Amino acid sequence: MNSLKKVILISAGDPASISSEITIKAIENSKIIKNIRPIVISSLNLIEDCKKNINSNIKLNEIKDKVNFSDYKENNLNIIPINLFEEIFFGKPNTKYASFIKNSIVDCVRIKMNSIASAIVTNPINKEIMYQSGFNFQGHTDFLASLSQYKKNPVMMLVTNGLKTIPLTIHVPIKNIPKLITKSLIEHSINIAKESLISLFNISKPRILVTGLNPHAGENGDIGNEEKKIIIPAINKAKKKYDCFLEGPVSADTAFSSKKRNDYDVAICMYHDQALIPIKTLDFFNGVNVTLGLDFIRTSPDHGTAFDIAGKNIANPDSLIAAINLAYQMSINKQDG
C-alpha cells in the first residue's frame, strides 16, 4: 500500500446511539482526506438497518484480510463484521449491548496491533450503560490503556482548530479535584504532552501553558494554596527535567483569549470543564478527543451518544470526520518522524 494511504479502524460505539449514522455519513463525506481507508468494526445488520433509516445507498464490502486489507474497495463502506445478537432500537440504550460495544473496541486494538492499520477511531459509548453491565473502567481512555502494551498512564487531549487542551482530572466531582492534583501528575502530563507534540503533531519545540486551579491562579496564596504548594513547584521541576518551554500557572479566565492562544501549543488544565469549555465554545462540531501515551494512535469525536436524536437522521458527522482526519495526519507525522 502507498505509504500515504492509511487504514483507519473505526469502532462501532453504542448501537442504540448516533454512532452508526455518523459513521455512514462520515465515510460518504468528501471532507474525508482522500488517502484515508476507513474500515468499520461493527455488525452488518446494524449498518444495513441504519443505511435504510438514513436513506443511504453506499455498498458494504466485507473485509476478510485483517492484516493487509487487500480486499478493501474504494467507494464502499468497508466493514469487519462482528456479531450483534440483540435487536436494536435506536435511541433506547440497553445493557445487553455492552458485550458488542466492548468486543468492537477490543477487536479494533487487536487488529491494529497485528496489521498495517495506522490508527483507531472510537465511536461514542455510554458510561452508565457500561458500568451497569460490569465494565470496570471510567471510560474509553482507561479501557484502552488496559489493552495497551505501554504501562504509561494515558493522557486525554482535546483538539480543535487553534487550540489543544489537556485536563489533568477528568470525570470526577469538583470537590475531589484539589486532592487529585499532584506534582507527579502535572510532571507526567507535561512530559507526555511534550513527547506527543513532537512525535504526533510535528511541533519541534512545544510551548506548554499550565492553568491555575483557583480564581486568578490563587493570587499568591490569597485564594487557595494549590498553586504555591503543588502547581508552581511541579512546573519548575518539569522545566529542568524535560527542557521545554513552560508558562504558568495562568489564570483560566485569560488563558483562552484569542491573543493568548497564540502563545502556546497546548494548555494543561486542572479539570474537565476548564479544558472542554473553550474547545466546545470555539468549535462545537469539530472537536476531537485524542489519547496520548498509548502504543497506538487513538482519536474519537468530542461528543456523546446523543440517544435523544438517534434514529432521526439529523446527527452531524463533523466531529467524527475531524477525528478520522486527525488520526490520519498524526500517523503521517509519526511516520515522517
Model-derived features: positions:
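Active-site glycine-rich loop that binds ribose-phosphate moieties when present
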Residues: 142-146, 150-152, 172-198
